[in-house]
């Protein structure tokens, strides 16, 4: 007895050309599931040096990764080409000159602090009775900024004489000077009192987000 069975709403049969060996793994095939070969098994079967032949219409995983992940060496070269030399503090000098000399020894203290900002602070203390009571200086280098702030301050006593001296130097890149000097001359009763300070800068390479003056 021969007849024809017609079913409705039945999906089409799996195309063996597109699915490959996947048909053998289906429960309706009557065959046990075939183990999926590993990458090294395919490489050994082809006899290649760890490479497998690409399938038509697909992309190899290595090719996709290479197109997305940039080369670190190329990034460093590109950043080095963008960065320009930057002036950083090289040395800092300060001096106070008195004529006549003070009767006692003058104490001089200095300190350097490295933090999110760069500070160089020094202080001069002298015995009571002298005109200049204190002298302090500060050099501030702010990270990720194109200017340098330099401040010098001298205080005088008693109060009827000049009480304070303040100077600020802002260094712009378009004026590439390396040495800045500030001088204060003070004459009281024909006695010379002189205050000198200087800042010296050098050019160094700078990479935008890597810390400030970590390389300075």
Curated annotation (Swiss-Prot):
A Pfam match: FAM101
- Compartments where found: Cytoplasm, Cytoskeleton
Q: Which GO terms describe its cellular component?
A: actin cytoskeleton; actin filament bundle; cytoplasm
Molecular function, one GO term: filamin binding
| Residue ranges of the region described as Disordered | 1-52
Query: Which terms under GO biological process does the entry name?
Result: actin cytoskeleton organization; actin filament bundle organization; epithelial to mesenchymal transition; negative regulation of bone mineralization involved in bone maturation; negative regulation of chondrocyte development; skeletal system morphogenesis
Q: Which domain of life is it from?
A: Eukaryota
Chief subcellular location equals cytoplasm
Which keywords accompany this UniProt record? Cytoplasm, Cytoskeleton, Phosphoprotein
**InterPro entries according to UniProt:** Refilin
Q: Which residues carry this modification: Phosphoserine?
A: 6, 26
Question: What task does this protein carry out?
Answer: Involved in the regulation of the perinuclear actin network and nuclear shape through interaction with filamins. Plays an essential role in the formation of cartilaginous skeletal elements.
Indicate the family of this protein. Answer: Belongs to the Refilin family.
Q: How does it assemble?
A: Interacts with FLNA and FLNB.
Name recorded for this polypeptide: Refilin-B
Q: Which lineage do the record's taxonomy fields give for this organism?
A: Eukaryota, Metazoa, Chordata, Craniata, Vertebrata
